[in-house]
């Protein structure tokens, strides 16, 4: 039996807390089980021959679509708000974890090179993206995503309204770093020509090796 993707106390805990308050713990467990079953159906319904990098993105889209379409049957007016609340909490927790990591010697200097490497490997052609790099220095990294599989997959899964949530996750996590500034002016999911991405090391720490 496949490991459950969703638990009531996992990354979607805020959503399930709302369900518990509205309908009780038993209903929350029922919806959780239905969401896991929906995920298994979706993830195996298409794109079964993807490489591991692209498969990771497909799985994330299926996960989001599964819980959204399941909860929507019960709480159509609230589901999107509850999902976005869960995404915000998860992103802020990720930012807090990154801020703790930045306290270790040398990590601030390594962060931008790591971001650039991740953008090329995880968010490059192997993952189904088309991106274009701009300015890359020790102080800042700029790149644009011109084609995004999240937009494609969410349309295929008939949930295009979930696309912007993936973009907001960047803002929650990278936009709340203590030592770096995240800048973005547009995204593909909200009708932009690209997803622009700029991560800049704050001036107060430029030149430091820590």
Model-derived features: positions:
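Short, well-structured alpha-helical interface segments that form or flank functional binding sites
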Residues: 62, 66, 169, 192
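Short, hydrophobic/π-rich interface segment
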Residues: 132-189
